[in-house]
Amino acid sequence: MGNSRNKRGKREANRQRTVEALARAQSGADTGAALQLPQKKFYRQRAHANPFSDHQLKYPLSPAHMDWASHYPAFENPDPAQTNLGGFRKLLKDVEVVDIGCGFGGLLIGLAPLLPETLIVGMEIRIQVLDYVNTRIQALRTQQRHFKLKSAGGGGSDAAPESPAAPPTPSEAASPDSTTPSEQQAPTTLVPGGFQNISAIRSNTMKFFPNFFGRGQLSKIFICFPDPHFKARKHKMRIISETLNAEYAYALRPGGLLYTITDVEEYHHWILRHFREPEVDGAVPCDDGADGIKELFERVSDEELQQDPCVEVMREATEEGKKVSRNKGNKYVAVFRRKADPEWPA
């Protein structure tokens, strides 16, 4: 028991040192060039959280009451009169991309330079994991600001290049030799957008997803390596269901994409059934919801997916994706396009 308290104290002390170092770098008292990113081992938490428990979450009354400006200060509307129903400053653009169950933020970091002008948010229910992600993002933003200042002022030899370097390819990011250093050391070059376009919030998607996003607001939704909940009595906890798919369809604009990836073949077939894809392996569609889901989504062909760089990031840049690659496991990808709303009969 005493050893457990000692380990917990060490983790808390390390997290505090990380926060203090970040605060010094943000204030300009310390350089951000060698800023260390937080380490996952000091942000330990259970792998799963019960979505049906009362987690005492804070959530907006409606999308118009959400405080997005605190998450994306670089995109804050400069006009102080531009506020939403919650009294918070509006943004110059809306959040368009969501990573449901973002975990330790690998997909957010991978997508940030790929979509530098698009606001991306991760949704995570676990407190310690969310704390890690946001600390990591703040550290990356701080280092990028230092690099930009040094580049503009012709700083010393440790200054970043004047032009943003191309981000590493997903396969390079997923190499086993790069996973450990990349967690500890921030990037050494400028990246497009400077990670100002990503953030993460604590939320229970199964309960409060429509409280954050309005109708047709999103262009992409990612669900990467979700908890498979193998036991039949826990299937109701799966993040893919016809009920939830209807909510995703509400928030996705026509033509928007919903990306899914899992390393569990049974879950992959579950996903296909709940998006009404019975032709795959002779699967029979489920009967737990309305047939209207089939009218809202269509599956994207493999030929189209080969041209989508987001698919490669989803496969190789996430922490779970890297682990599956190291274990030489299979990855099952399915992407669905939001159809235009059907017309009402005359």
From Swiss-Prot:
Please name the GO terms that the record assigns under molecular function: tRNA (guanine(46)-N7)-methyltransferase activity; tRNA binding
Annotated TM spans: none
Q: Does the entry feature the keyword RNA-binding, yes or no? A: yes
Q: In which pathway does it act?
A: tRNA modification; N(7)-methylguanine-tRNA biosynthesis
**In which broad location class does this protein mainly occur, judging by the first location in its UniProt entry?**
nucleus
Could you tell me the keywords of this UniProt record? Methyltransferase, Nucleus, RNA-binding, S-adenosyl-L-methionine, Transferase, tRNA processing, tRNA-binding
The enzyme's E.C. designation: 2.1.1.33
The UniProt entry's GO CC annotations, sorted and at most eight, read: nucleus; tRNA methyltransferase complex
- Using the UniProt annotation, give all residue ranges assigned to the region (Disordered): 149-191
* Record's subunit section: Forms a complex with trm82.
Give the family this protein belongs to, as stated in its UniProt record.
Answer: Belongs to the class I-like SAM-binding methyltransferase superfamily. TrmB family.
User: Which named protein is this?
Assistant: tRNA (guanine-N(7)-)-methyltransferase
Organism name: Aspergillus terreus (strain NIH 2624 / FGSC A1156)
